[in-house]
């Protein structure tokens, strides 16, 4: 039985949880939108993508603030089991 391929979105988004990867690819920005968008306390410029490949964990910074302003080249295509963390802004 094939395990459903998903990515996980946590932290300051409206609906944290898993998002299925169906057919086409999805980016960090799109996954956040599918999670209801950024929460009121989000710090989008400090968003992190946590990826484990071959047992090696890497943390990739993804500046959602710049991507929202049109710098689409900064967005990252997600792989199964990727975890997106949107931190809370510190005031």
Where are these predicted regions, by residue range?
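Ser/Thr/Pro/Gly-biased, low-complexity, turn-/loop-rich segments
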Residues: 1-91
